[in-house]
Regions:
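Core beta-strand-centered patch of the WYL/Sm-like small regulatory domain
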Residues: 2-122
Length: 122
């Protein structure tokens, strides 16, 4: 058996894919800290010079677990883009909840879903 190369994405490619997903209000699947996650990217930019994103995680795993609320399972997550791997667009429905407080995940905002008009589904 020939070993297969690991699926590697450049950080810039990952970031652009997340930006596209956010603009389309489309979910992504990814690996973060070795755990599979289903995420909806809401805010993208930099914190202390590093690329970060604020996601709503609605599925997959997490070391801290996912709470179950009235809308189902989910929670807000601030994740470093460089720690994401195997990021793929998904056909899952867009998931979100009102932000209970001002986000502090991203200092220099490049993209915020809440500041963009929703795309018209065709």
């Amino acid at each position: 058996m020939t070993p297969q190369p690991a699926k590697v994405q450049a950080i810039s490619d990952t970031y652009e894919l997340l930006r596209l997903a956010a603009a389309r209000r489309q979910a992504v699947a990814a690996i973060y800290d070795g755990l599979p996650r289903l995420l909806c990217p809401h805010v993208l930019g930099r914190k202390s010079g590093q690329l970060h994103a604020l996601f709503y995680q609605f599925g997959g795993s997490s070391r801290s677990g996912l709470p179950v609320g009235p809308e189902g399972m989910g929670d807000w997550r601030c994740l470093a883009v460089e720690k994401l791997s195997e990021v793929e667009l998904r056909a899952d429905a867009w998931h979100t909840e009102p932000r209970s407080r001002r986000q502090t995940c991203v200092d220099e905002i490049d993209f915020d879903v809440d500041a963009q008009p929703a795309e018209d589904p065709q």
